[in-house]
Amino acid sequence: MTKLNAQVKGSLNITTPGIQIWRIEAMQMVPVPSSTFGSFFDGDCYVVLAIHKTSSTLSYDIHYWIGQDSSQDEQGAAAIYTTQMDDYLKGRAVQHREVQGNESETFRSYFKQGLVIRKGGVASGMKHVETNSCDVQRLLHVKGKRNVLAGEVEMSWKSFNRGDVFLLDLGKLIIQWNGPESNRMERLRGMALAKEIRDQERGGRTYVGVVDGEKEGDSPQLMAIMNHVLGPRKELKAAISDSVVEPAAKAALKLYHVSDSEGKLVVREVATRPLTQDLLKHEDCYILDQGGLKIFVWKGKNANAQERSGAMSQALNFIKAKQYPPSTQVEVQNDGAESPIFQQLFQKWTVPNRTSGLGKTHTVGSVAKVEQVKFDALTMHVQPQVAAQQKMVDDGSGEVQVWRIEDLELVPVESKWLGHFYGGDCYLLLYTYLIGEKQHYLLYIWQGSQASQDEIAASAYQAVLLDQKYNDEPVQIRVTMGKEPPHLMSIFKGRMVVYQGGTSRKNNLEPVPSTRLFQVRGTNADNTKAFEVTARATSLNSNDVFILKTPSCCYLWCGKGCSGDEREMAKMVADTISRTEKQVVVEGQEPANFWMALGGKAPYANTKRLQEENQVITPRLFECSNQTGRFLATEIFDFNQDDLEEEDVFLLDVWDQVFFWIGKHANEEEKKAAATTVQEYLKTHPGNRDLETPIIVVKQGHEPPTFTGWFLAWDPFKWSNTKSYDDLKAELGNSGDWSQIADEVMSPKVDVFTANTSLSSGPLPTFPLEQLVNKSVEDLPEGVDPSRKEEHLSTEDFTRALGMTPAAFSALPRWKQQNIKKEKGLF
């Protein structure tokens, strides 16, 4: 049984955020130098430890990566070391199995400049790249718009296609060729990788040139080099579309109970989507199958040792039984240390006795009583992380204008109706606040539950017009009735009233109910609202205060579980609802007229409201696209401001509200489809999300602190001096004298392997096989080039000695040719 040796334990840093990498060499873990992080050999296996800082704690991910040409023994050792490292971390890590070519986005995200897969491995003498070494000849196929994966391919035009980016790496020169159908982001990622190779692997001693496939005529010297090295070019292959995963597949969840009775894996289906946390019992192990795309194994803290230690094996056996591809991703989750990705596959994930620090949306029936803190706008912008958690840009004391949708147009709401929201109406509310001398805007779009579809559509349309009037600066916040965020409530200072239906417009012919019942929630002027409920005794709740308005009087009913602050706020909002004298009624001492107004006594909720466990919320960022006619969201892990690209739109999900960020160069269709895109995201979310979750539309350059607070070290000036693609291209290759470099590369004196390199090229004399095999330089016949022994063989002897024809041998990568020559005694 392999074990973490003392050297590994001694060098293992488990307190500093970042990554550490080991390669499996002779069944031992050997550290990989940090200067070569992101470079992997396909003949090897690796173990990667990633440490993340989350608030005041650290979280751990352990990945073992399997190269396609690695041995079974190496794969087994990597898996065992991963389990043992998790044990060393006391079960606090999430384990991941990564297979070459099907790496998880989490794994790729660690290597911001790109993941490079090289041919060879430790068994063939391949070492991780040494800085300043220019003895390299390879062609890298660069894939990916976000997290780049670059793999070595045959050095020939046959490897190219019109849609991707390729790096021809000749040691002292790197030529980046951009397919004519590749996009700007793919080209920029390729340039970043080329720059990384130049600066990190070559110590800055390599020239980099860029060729745009649609304008090859602009780079004649670079094209001459490429044609010399790669041979004559035929018609290029068409672009290869990136594989996409349908949202429906991600949402196809099945939970299985796993037991290992009598040495046999027994799997029993427990549930399908929607999944709830209470399905997971601490005494058991489970497999969660996400549509065959990824397999999660959950290990209960009280499960038996054999089942816990065999979790990864159970997953691999499950994959075989289901006939899923061997490259299927696997994550092993420890009870109590689950990853955010795993948690959000469930409808709700809570952790007892943990404070999340996130305010909750106030809704009828289930409302978290969160104490709001009063902040001014300047403080919120200086401390955006507080603004993000409290969902407050300021204390609500800015200027406000309110319009109602009437006949599909905007009509200002009279001052006496400010703070009154009717379920039959839609409203636009423009809030203006100052940071220094600069004005900032929030545009709330409030949509009543009984408003017509035409009015709802008109509210969205009018919001666009109002947004344009203010130069696209307002942050748009869509609010469905009952989901009012804290900041909206703070604007009305404890006097916000939401009616079930009806309207406040003039000439309204609908009869106004003579008796109305309102449930009041809130503890101060910044978080209180009264929400109309059905005027029946069954609507009461012992934990709250209710206002009962009748033709003759107004009752203030105080449940036994309400607080003094709640009673005081109810008195304040009651003055907004009724000007008559308020009669305070204590639960259990109601007069007969009170019950008569409600249609008689009836049972109602009177059990003590339990202390709500705080839901674990981890913000998640997604790049969104609907260009293919269907919605696609690609998650960005360990995100920061640099991940927000000007050409794209992004979705920031903080669970009880969703931000939609629009880059200034995003296409118009994606801008228009903001609300639809977020709705589609919520519909296809595996956790069965609330479709009425507030949606906040944010434009680049006008981000509120409630958005920027989710990003570490947000720079408001980041986009003020951005360079164009042409500027970056010129900057990358502005030091190259291409004429001189072309002469050097194409000179016969320079040993550059090309697609036309022939084993029979040059006037080399032929010798019998026995005079060349296993001979030292001193024992070779006169006239033999020691570095090209195989080229002195006849075609027949060559095929017999090396097991292949000269043409087949010449098509192999250089490293593989060298290995074969060593094996056959011709090195």
Swiss-Prot record:
The Gelsolin-like repeat ranges on this chain: 27-76, 148-188, 265-309, 407-457, 528-568, 631-672
Tissues showing expression: Expressed in small intestin, colon, kidney and enterocytes (at protein level).
Gene Ontology cellular component annotations, sorted alphabetically: actin filament bundle; brush border; cytoplasm; filopodium; filopodium tip; lamellipodium; microvillus; plasma membrane
Annotated spans, LPA/PIP2-binding site 1: 112-119
Principal subcellular localisation of the protein: cytoplasm
Subcellular location: Cytoplasm, Cytoskeleton; Cell projection, Microvillus; Cell projection, Lamellipodium; Cell projection, Ruffle
Disulfide links within the chain: none
Alphabetical list of Pfam families matching this protein: Gelsolin, VHP
Gene3D superfamilies in UniProt: Severin, Villin headpiece domain
Region (LPA/PIP2-binding site 2) residue spans: 138-146
Region feature (Headpiece): 735-827
Maturation and modification: Phosphorylated on tyrosine residues by SRC. The unphosphorylated form increases the initial rate of actin-nucleating activity, whereas the tyrosine phosphorylated form inhibits actin-nucleating activity, enhances actin-bundling activity and enhances actin-severing activity by reducing high Ca(2+) requirements. The tyrosine phosphorylated form does not regulate actin-capping activity.
Keywords of this entry: Actin capping, Actin-binding, Apoptosis, Calcium, Cell projection, Cytoplasm, Cytoskeleton, Metal-binding, Phosphoprotein, Repeat
Domain notes: Consists of a large core fragment in the N-terminal portion and a small headpiece (HP) in the C-terminal portion. The core fragment is necessary for both actin-nucleating and -severing activities, whereas the HP binds F-actin strongly in both the presence and absence of calcium and is necessary in actin-bundling activity. The Gelsolin-like 1 repeat is necessary for the actin-capping activity. The entire core fragment is necessary for the actin-severing activity.
Record-given protein name: Villin-1
Lineage: Eukaryota, Metazoa, Chordata, Craniata, Vertebrata
This protein's encoding gene: Vil1
